[in-house]
Amino acid sequence: MLKKFIYFFFTIFYIVNLHSITIDGELSEPEWQGANSFTDFLTIFPDTLDTPKYKTEAKYFADEKGIYFAFINYQPKEKQTFQKHPRDSFYANADRNYVIIDFNNNANIGYEFTVTLGNSIRDAIFVDENDFSDEWDAIWYAKTKSYEDYWISEFLIPWDVAPMINVEGPYREISVSLARWTFSENEVYNSPGLNFYKSPFLSKFKKLQVRNLNTQKTRIDFFPYASFTNNFIQDNRQINIGGEIFWDINQNSKIDFTLNPDFGQVESDDVIVNFSAIETYYPCLLYT
Protein backbone atom coordinates (compact mmCIF):
# COMPACT_ATOMS: atom_id res chain seq x y z
CA MET A 1 0.00 0.00 0.00
CA LEU A 2 2.80 2.40 0.89
CA LYS A 3 4.56 1.70 -2.40
CA LYS A 4 1.37 2.46 -4.34
CA PHE A 5 0.91 5.72 -2.47
CA ILE A 6 4.51 6.80 -3.12
CA TYR A 7 4.19 5.88 -6.80
CA PHE A 8 0.90 7.82 -7.06
CA PHE A 9 2.40 10.86 -5.31
CA PHE A 10 5.43 11.07 -7.57
CA THR A 11 3.30 10.47 -10.68
CA ILE A 12 1.07 13.41 -9.81
CA PHE A 13 4.12 15.51 -8.94
CA TYR A 14 5.69 14.67 -12.31
CA ILE A 15 2.52 15.46 -14.27
CA VAL A 16 2.07 18.81 -12.53
CA ASN A 17 5.67 19.83 -13.12
CA LEU A 18 5.65 18.51 -16.68
CA HIS A 19 3.22 21.28 -17.61
CA SER A 20 4.78 24.05 -15.51
CA ILE A 21 7.27 26.67 -16.64
CA THR A 22 10.69 26.53 -15.00
CA ILE A 23 12.31 29.94 -14.64
CA ASP A 24 15.87 29.00 -15.57
CA GLY A 25 16.93 31.19 -18.51
CA GLU A 26 16.69 28.32 -21.00
CA LEU A 27 13.26 28.86 -22.66
CA SER A 28 12.99 25.14 -23.31
CA GLU A 29 9.22 24.85 -22.78
CA PRO A 30 6.91 24.68 -25.83
CA GLU A 31 5.03 27.78 -24.63
CA TRP A 32 8.05 29.91 -25.52
CA GLN A 33 8.09 28.58 -29.08
CA GLY A 34 4.60 29.95 -29.71
CA ALA A 35 4.95 33.11 -27.61
CA ASN A 36 4.43 36.59 -29.04
CA SER A 37 7.69 38.38 -29.80
CA PHE A 38 9.09 41.67 -31.08
CA THR A 39 12.49 43.22 -31.81
CA ASP A 40 11.68 46.93 -32.28
CA PHE A 41 14.20 48.24 -29.73
CA LEU A 42 15.75 51.69 -30.17
CA THR A 43 18.78 53.31 -28.54
CA ILE A 44 17.59 55.75 -25.87
CA PHE A 45 20.96 56.26 -24.14
CA PRO A 46 22.59 58.04 -25.77
CA ASP A 47 19.30 59.57 -26.86
CA THR A 48 19.63 58.96 -30.60
CA LEU A 49 16.77 56.52 -31.29
CA ASP A 50 19.18 54.70 -33.60
CA THR A 51 19.05 50.99 -34.33
CA PRO A 52 20.97 49.29 -31.47
CA LYS A 53 24.40 47.77 -32.01
CA TYR A 54 23.14 44.46 -30.61
CA LYS A 55 19.81 42.86 -31.48
CA THR A 56 17.30 42.14 -28.71
CA GLU A 57 14.26 39.88 -29.01
CA ALA A 58 11.51 40.02 -26.38
CA LYS A 59 8.86 37.32 -25.86
CA TYR A 60 5.78 37.15 -23.65
CA PHE A 61 2.73 35.05 -22.78
CA ALA A 62 0.43 34.49 -19.78
CA ASP A 63 -0.99 31.52 -17.90
CA GLU A 64 -2.78 30.94 -14.60
CA LYS A 65 0.35 31.81 -12.60
CA GLY A 66 1.08 35.17 -14.18
CA ILE A 67 2.74 36.94 -17.10
CA TYR A 68 6.02 35.62 -18.49
CA PHE A 69 8.64 37.71 -20.27
CA ALA A 70 11.92 36.69 -21.85
CA PHE A 71 14.77 38.59 -23.50
CA ILE A 72 17.23 37.09 -25.96
CA ASN A 73 20.15 39.52 -25.79
CA TYR A 74 22.51 38.97 -28.72
CA GLN A 75 26.06 39.83 -27.70
CA PRO A 76 29.45 38.03 -27.84
CA LYS A 77 30.31 36.26 -24.61
CA GLU A 78 33.49 38.31 -24.14
CA LYS A 79 31.33 41.47 -24.11
CA GLN A 80 28.86 40.16 -21.55
CA THR A 81 29.26 41.68 -18.08
CA PHE A 82 28.31 39.79 -14.91
CA GLN A 83 27.95 41.15 -11.38
CA LYS A 84 25.92 40.25 -8.32
CA HIS A 85 24.71 43.17 -6.23
CA PRO A 86 22.33 43.96 -3.36
CA ARG A 87 18.63 44.04 -4.15
CA ASP A 88 17.38 47.33 -5.64
CA SER A 89 20.89 48.52 -6.46
CA PHE A 90 20.85 50.73 -9.57
CA TYR A 91 24.52 51.45 -10.16
CA ALA A 92 25.77 47.91 -10.76
CA ASN A 93 28.41 47.09 -13.35
CA ALA A 94 26.39 44.48 -15.20
CA ASP A 95 24.18 43.90 -18.23
CA ARG A 96 20.50 43.93 -17.34
CA ASN A 97 16.93 43.74 -18.61
CA TYR A 98 13.97 45.82 -17.47
CA VAL A 99 10.25 45.06 -17.62
CA ILE A 100 7.96 47.94 -16.64
CA ILE A 101 4.24 47.10 -16.66
CA ASP A 102 1.09 49.18 -16.35
CA PHE A 103 -1.35 46.38 -15.53
CA ASN A 104 -4.43 48.60 -15.83
CA ASN A 105 -3.30 50.41 -18.99
CA ASN A 106 -4.30 53.79 -17.57
CA ALA A 107 -0.87 55.44 -17.05
CA ASN A 108 -1.41 55.79 -13.29
CA ILE A 109 1.33 53.47 -12.08
CA GLY A 110 4.02 51.32 -13.64
CA TYR A 111 5.79 48.45 -11.88
CA GLU A 112 9.44 47.82 -12.70
CA PHE A 113 11.08 44.38 -12.60
CA THR A 114 14.80 44.26 -13.40
CA VAL A 115 17.35 41.44 -13.42
CA THR A 116 21.08 41.67 -14.10
CA LEU A 117 23.35 39.14 -15.75
CA GLY A 118 24.34 37.78 -12.36
CA ASN A 119 20.77 37.08 -11.21
CA SER A 120 20.40 40.08 -8.91
CA ILE A 121 17.06 41.87 -9.01
CA ARG A 122 15.48 45.25 -8.51
CA ASP A 123 11.84 46.30 -8.33
CA ALA A 124 10.38 49.79 -8.23
CA ILE A 125 7.37 51.86 -9.25
CA PHE A 126 6.74 54.82 -11.57
CA VAL A 127 3.95 57.34 -10.94
CA ASP A 128 3.14 60.76 -12.43
CA GLU A 129 4.61 59.63 -15.76
CA ASN A 130 8.25 59.19 -14.65
CA ASP A 131 8.45 59.81 -10.90
CA PHE A 132 10.52 56.85 -9.68
CA SER A 133 10.68 55.11 -6.28
CA ASP A 134 12.44 51.88 -5.29
CA GLU A 135 10.64 51.67 -1.93
CA TRP A 136 8.33 48.99 -3.35
CA ASP A 137 9.22 45.29 -3.16
CA ALA A 138 7.29 42.29 -4.43
CA ILE A 139 7.54 38.53 -4.85
CA TRP A 140 8.41 37.62 -8.43
CA TYR A 141 10.94 35.47 -10.24
CA ALA A 142 13.71 35.96 -12.78
CA LYS A 143 16.74 34.05 -13.97
CA THR A 144 19.49 34.68 -16.51
CA LYS A 145 21.79 32.35 -18.42
CA SER A 146 24.81 33.11 -20.59
CA TYR A 147 25.50 31.47 -23.95
CA GLU A 148 28.28 31.88 -26.51
CA ASP A 149 26.68 34.60 -28.65
CA TYR A 150 23.81 35.78 -26.47
CA TRP A 151 22.36 35.71 -22.98
CA ILE A 152 18.78 35.13 -21.88
CA SER A 153 16.66 36.53 -19.07
CA GLU A 154 13.38 34.90 -18.08
CA PHE A 155 10.69 36.49 -15.86
CA LEU A 156 7.55 35.30 -14.09
CA ILE A 157 5.44 38.15 -12.75
CA PRO A 158 2.56 36.63 -10.71
CA TRP A 159 -0.96 37.96 -11.07
CA ASP A 160 -1.10 38.92 -7.39
CA VAL A 161 2.02 41.08 -7.51
CA ALA A 162 -0.10 44.26 -7.64
CA PRO A 163 -3.75 45.40 -7.47
CA MET A 164 -5.52 45.24 -10.83
CA ILE A 165 -8.84 46.47 -12.15
CA ASN A 166 -11.28 43.69 -13.01
CA VAL A 167 -11.49 43.11 -16.76
CA GLU A 168 -14.23 41.18 -18.54
CA GLY A 169 -13.48 38.95 -21.48
CA PRO A 170 -10.73 36.51 -22.46
CA TYR A 171 -7.99 39.12 -22.85
CA ARG A 172 -6.51 41.90 -20.74
CA GLU A 173 -4.78 44.87 -22.35
CA ILE A 174 -1.65 45.96 -20.52
CA SER A 175 1.04 48.44 -21.48
CA VAL A 176 4.76 47.88 -21.12
CA SER A 177 8.18 49.41 -21.55
CA LEU A 178 10.98 46.87 -22.06
CA ALA A 179 14.62 47.85 -21.87
CA ARG A 180 18.15 46.48 -21.99
CA TRP A 181 21.30 48.07 -20.61
CA THR A 182 24.48 46.91 -22.36
CA PHE A 183 27.26 47.70 -19.91
CA SER A 184 30.23 47.20 -22.25
CA GLU A 185 28.82 49.80 -24.65
CA ASN A 186 27.18 51.95 -21.95
CA GLU A 187 24.00 51.96 -24.02
CA VAL A 188 20.33 51.45 -23.18
CA TYR A 189 17.87 50.00 -25.69
CA ASN A 190 14.12 50.35 -25.23
CA SER A 191 10.92 49.20 -26.85
CA PRO A 192 8.96 51.29 -27.80
CA GLY A 193 11.86 53.78 -27.69
CA LEU A 194 11.09 55.62 -24.43
CA ASN A 195 13.56 57.36 -22.13
CA PHE A 196 12.97 56.82 -18.40
CA TYR A 197 13.98 60.40 -17.63
CA LYS A 198 11.66 62.09 -20.11
CA SER A 199 7.99 62.86 -19.62
CA PRO A 200 5.55 61.64 -20.80
CA PHE A 201 6.68 58.10 -20.05
CA LEU A 202 3.88 55.90 -18.66
CA SER A 203 1.30 57.14 -21.15
CA LYS A 204 3.53 56.21 -24.10
CA PHE A 205 3.96 52.53 -23.22
CA LYS A 206 3.53 49.77 -25.80
CA LYS A 207 0.08 48.14 -25.71
CA LEU A 208 -0.04 44.35 -25.39
CA GLN A 209 -2.86 41.85 -25.04
CA VAL A 210 -2.46 38.85 -22.73
CA ARG A 211 -4.86 36.13 -21.69
CA ASN A 212 -7.07 37.40 -18.86
CA LEU A 213 -6.41 34.61 -16.37
CA ASN A 214 -6.28 36.75 -13.25
CA THR A 215 -8.85 35.57 -10.71
CA GLN A 216 -10.08 37.16 -7.52
CA LYS A 217 -8.67 35.39 -4.49
CA THR A 218 -7.82 36.22 -0.91
CA ARG A 219 -4.25 35.73 0.25
CA ILE A 220 -2.71 36.34 3.67
CA ASP A 221 1.05 36.40 4.28
CA PHE A 222 2.52 36.65 7.79
CA PHE A 223 6.15 37.57 8.45
CA PRO A 224 7.03 37.20 12.15
CA TYR A 225 9.95 38.86 13.89
CA ALA A 226 11.62 38.29 17.25
CA SER A 227 14.19 40.36 19.13
CA PHE A 228 16.16 39.46 22.27
CA THR A 229 18.18 41.95 24.31
CA ASN A 230 20.36 41.29 27.31
CA ASN A 231 21.41 44.22 29.50
CA PHE A 232 24.59 43.07 31.19
CA ILE A 233 24.87 46.30 33.19
CA GLN A 234 21.42 46.13 34.79
CA ASP A 235 21.20 42.32 34.53
CA ASN A 236 17.82 42.11 32.79
CA ARG A 237 16.53 40.65 29.57
CA GLN A 238 13.79 41.64 27.17
CA ILE A 239 12.07 39.73 24.37
CA ASN A 240 10.02 41.49 21.70
CA ILE A 241 7.75 39.63 19.30
CA GLY A 242 5.84 41.08 16.39
CA GLY A 243 5.53 41.00 12.65
CA GLU A 244 3.75 42.09 9.51
CA ILE A 245 0.55 40.77 7.94
CA PHE A 246 -0.19 41.39 4.26
CA TRP A 247 -3.82 40.71 3.34
CA ASP A 248 -4.71 40.68 -0.36
CA ILE A 249 -8.48 40.99 -0.14
CA ASN A 250 -9.00 40.93 -3.91
CA GLN A 251 -7.46 42.35 -7.07
CA ASN A 252 -8.21 45.92 -6.05
CA SER A 253 -7.71 45.98 -2.29
CA LYS A 254 -4.82 45.22 0.03
CA ILE A 255 -4.32 45.83 3.74
CA ASP A 256 -0.99 45.75 5.58
CA PHE A 257 -0.85 45.28 9.36
CA THR A 258 2.15 45.88 11.62
CA LEU A 259 2.22 44.22 15.04
CA ASN A 260 4.52 45.60 17.75
CA PRO A 261 7.03 47.31 15.42
CA ASP A 262 9.23 48.69 18.21
CA PHE A 263 12.40 46.71 17.70
CA GLY A 264 13.73 47.94 14.39
CA GLN A 265 12.70 44.94 12.24
CA VAL A 266 9.64 46.12 10.34
CA GLU A 267 10.61 47.62 7.01
CA SER A 268 7.57 49.90 6.74
CA ASP A 269 8.38 51.63 10.03
CA ASP A 270 11.77 53.34 9.99
CA VAL A 271 10.97 55.86 12.76
CA ILE A 272 10.10 53.85 15.86
CA VAL A 273 13.17 51.91 16.94
CA ASN A 274 13.85 50.16 20.22
CA PHE A 275 17.01 51.74 21.63
CA SER A 276 17.60 49.05 24.20
CA ALA A 277 20.85 48.71 26.09
CA ILE A 278 22.55 46.05 24.02
CA GLU A 279 22.15 48.16 20.89
CA THR A 280 22.99 51.65 22.08
CA TYR A 281 24.79 51.58 25.40
CA TYR A 282 28.57 51.99 25.08
CA PRO A 283 30.25 52.38 28.50
CA CYS A 284 33.17 54.77 28.45
CA LEU A 285 36.20 54.36 30.71
CA LEU A 286 38.09 57.55 31.52
CA TYR A 287 41.71 57.51 32.58
CA THR A 288 43.41 60.44 34.30
Model regions: which residues?
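N-terminal secretory signal peptides that target proteins for export/translocation
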Residues: M1-L2
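Sec-dependent N-terminal signal peptides
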Residues: F5-V16
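Structural preference for beta-rich elements and adjacent junctions enriched in aromatics
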Residues: H19-L286
